[in-house]
């Protein structure tokens, strides 16, 4: 069986080189074109899906919609869930990456961005931009909504959704598309492929390119490739 991942298209804050995380920003024209191209690749390669999973952030939802529209599959069920959100970058969200490196040093920022188990500073829950003040998370217990995450914590957040939703869909024979974010997809890939804590630091997923994971009938990893 095959599972297809797509990282959302290039966003407004990708273009501005800002830390994004759980902040809700839109796609750029480049991002829209990336999503259209991804949908056409899937159409040309004959990929059909029974269900699509995405996050509750606009850039991923729009990417999912565009991909499905371009591949003539906009009608299939979509499941939006906060567990597929991008990694929460804490107090770094909204900051310029270059300016942050100048303030804290390249090494410290690299650790915050790439280490598996070290988180950036927390975002104050009272901050107007905190997810605690966003109604799309109002149904969640306060202690579940993050103030900052590393990749390890992101994996712990994503894994229940894999086990409860994505894996059962695959095992039931459904053809699955997951349109999400760089780090939530990296976390899922780490679990599925078996990437080590060290190797995951250098594992990247580019925006808007369909990544196909081939799995056996027990969801063991076989191979991966980009369309």
Swiss-Prot record:
The active site is at residues 8, 86. One of its GO terms (molecular function) is phosphoglycerate mutase activity. Keywords: Gluconeogenesis, Glycolysis, Isomerase. The record marks 181 as: Transition state stabilizer. Its EC number is 5.4.2.11. It holds the Pfam family His_Phos_1. It comes from the Bacteria. Pathway: Carbohydrate degradation; glycolysis; pyruvate from D-glyceraldehyde 3-phosphate: step 3/5. Substrate binds at residues 7-14, 20-21, 59, 86-89, 97, 113-114, 182-183. SUPFAM superfamilies: Phosphoglycerate mutase-like. Catalyzes the interconversion of 2-phosphoglycerate and 3-phosphoglycerate. Belongs to the phosphoglycerate mutase family. BPG-dependent PGAM subfamily. Homodimer. NCBIfam families: pgm_1, PRK14115.1, PRK14118.1. This is 2,3-bisphosphoglycerate-dependent phosphoglycerate mutase.
């Amino acid at each position: 069986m095959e599972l297809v991942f797509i990282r959302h298209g290039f966003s407004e804050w990708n273009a501005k080189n800002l830390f994004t995380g759980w902040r809700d920003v839109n796609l750029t024209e480049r991002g829209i074109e990336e999503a259209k191209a991804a949908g056409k690749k899937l159409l040309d390669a004959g990929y059909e899906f029974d269900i699509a999973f995405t996050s509750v952030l606009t850039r991923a939802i729009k990417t999912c919609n565009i991909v499905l529209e371009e591949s003539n599959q906009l009608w299939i069920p979509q499941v939006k869930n906060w567990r597929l959100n991008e990694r929460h970058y804490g107090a770094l969200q909204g900051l310029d990456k270059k300016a942050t490196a100048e303030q804290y040093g390249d090494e410290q920022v690299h650790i915050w961005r790439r280490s598996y188990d070290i988180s950036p500073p927390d975002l104050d829950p009272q901050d107007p931009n905190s997810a605690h003040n966003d109604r799309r998370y109002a149904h969640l217990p306060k202690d579940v909504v993050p103030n900052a995450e590393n990749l390890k914590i992101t994996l712990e957040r994503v894994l229940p959704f894999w086990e409860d939703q994505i894996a059962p869909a695959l095992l039931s024979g459904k053809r699955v598309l997951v349109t999400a974010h760089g780090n939530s997809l990296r976390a899922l890939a780490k679990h599925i492929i078996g990437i080590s804590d060290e190797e995951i630091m250098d594992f990247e997923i580019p925006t808007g390119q369909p990544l196909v994971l081939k799995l056996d009938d027990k969801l063991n990893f076989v191979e991966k490739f980009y369309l």
